[in-house]
Swiss-Prot record:
SUPFAM superfamilies: YbeD/HP0495-like. Coiled coil: none annotated. GO terms for cellular component: cytosol. It comes from the Bacteria. Pfam families: DUF493 (PF04359). This is UPF0250 protein Sputw3181_1029. It comes from Shewanella sp. (strain W3-18-1). Belongs to the UPF0250 family.
């Protein structure tokens, strides 16, 4: 697992924003939502912005997380999506 201090800094459960940056592909948003649904089922409305040249998408999604481990799992799973460059 990751070595984070989320448990010291946050009160759970809480809404937590994830920003996923990846190659511009029409299915990227659907892949992000699918991973989030697997770990935190809910009704999500992510926002997607294209980079200035259109090469990358930035997807922001707010997820209700229940623990430090929950956040770390989501970071790991989102980073494993094909085409994802960064998870912030």
């Amino acid at each position: 697992m990751l070595d984070t201090k989320f448990d010291e800094l946050m009160d759970f459960p809480c809404a937590f924003p994830f920003k996923v940056v990846g190659d511009a592909h029409e299915a990227l948003t659907d892949r992000v939502v699918a991973v989030v649904q697997k770990h935190a089922p809910g009704d999500y409305a992510p926002t997607t912005k294209a980079s200035s040249k259109g090469s990358y998408y930035s997807i922001t999604i707010r997820v209700t997380v229940t623990s430090k481990d929950h956040i770390e799992t989501l970071y790991t799973e989102l980073a494993a999506i094909e085409g994802v460059r960064r998870v912030l």
